[in-house]
């Protein structure tokens, strides 16, 4: 049986308009001047044998998930969404109980790396969110490269919360620098069975050509600690510094310590089960 490949993160977004300006507060700048839409993404996926993608609305679109939800409605067998939620807004508390009733919505993706957002992990702003996500069974992806230990504390306090650490807990500031310290912080969370990790966008964190040999032992340590069922491949296409194909063949061809069964879990089955997005043969 062929492996179903799922990209665990791609940002898609629309053009900026006078009535829909990009956000600048607690947000990154667009990764490229021309928006990446679902039609282009489908072409890239088809060219590389990737069946599905988890669409993650980017921070510069604020808290609009519409572009991604439209893609999921048009192609429900190809796209699903981990949407953004304004954790600091009181009105968001009313949204989470019915969050997954939106067609194509699987959970929430949070980012704590820009503006005031990192403070929300420490000042109590985000406390309600972890409680509610656990209570309502909403999986969470979290990008907080400077606060991975804090995410571990949160996961330990909320054992029913399904938490995914984005991009192996790495920061763009580490590109070309030793990554061992950041990986060590991540490995301490492996004992928490409600924590998984996206082994995604990894070429972005090294300053060397394919096949990115510096990454191989680090990926091995993460996979051995979390086990393949809790490691999810992904590209972060719009931010990717390598080709899409290279990001994929890094796992399919270059990591010789991975068995075929390991690849099945890492490349798609793991995230499908974690996010309750049934694979075709399971539907």
Positions of the model-derived regions?
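Catalytic pocket-lining loop regions of alpha/beta-barrel enzymes
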Residues: 119-233, 279-281
């Amino acid at each position: 049986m062929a492996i179903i490949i799922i990209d665990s993160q791609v940002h898609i977004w629309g053009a900026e308009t006078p009535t829909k300006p990009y956000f600048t507060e607690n947000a990154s700048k667009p990764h490229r001047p021309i928006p990446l839409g679902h039609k282009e993404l489908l072409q890239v996926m088809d060219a590389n044998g990737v069946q599905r993608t988890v669409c993650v609305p980017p921070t510069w679109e604020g808290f609009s998930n519409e572009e991604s939800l439209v893609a999921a409605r048009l192609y429900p067998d190809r796209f699903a969404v981990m949407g953004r939620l304004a954790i600091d807004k009181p009105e968001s508390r009313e949204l989470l109980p019915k969050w997954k009733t939106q067609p194509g919505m699987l959970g929430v993706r949070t980012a704590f790396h820009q503006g005031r957002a990192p403070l929300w992990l420490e000042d109590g702003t985000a406390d309600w969110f972890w409680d509610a996500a656990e209570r309502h069974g909403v999986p969470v992806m979290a990008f907080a490269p400077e606060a991975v230990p804090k995410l571990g504390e949160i996961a330990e306090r909320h054992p029913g919360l399904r938490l995914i650490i984005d991009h192996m807990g790495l920061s763009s500031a580490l590109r070309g620098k030793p990554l061992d310290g950041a990986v060590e912080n991540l490995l301490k969370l492996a004992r928490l069975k409600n924590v998984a990790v996206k082994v995604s966008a990894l070429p972005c964190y090294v300053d060397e050509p394919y096949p990115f040999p510096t990454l191989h032992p680090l990926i091995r340590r993460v996979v051995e600690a979390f086990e393949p069922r809790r490691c999810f491949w992904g590209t972060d296409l719009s931010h990717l510094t390598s080709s899409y194909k290279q990001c994929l063949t890094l796992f399919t061809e270059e990591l010789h310590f991975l068995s075929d069964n390991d690849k099945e879990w890492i490349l798609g089955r793991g995230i499908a089960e974690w996010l309750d997005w049934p694979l075709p043969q399971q539907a």
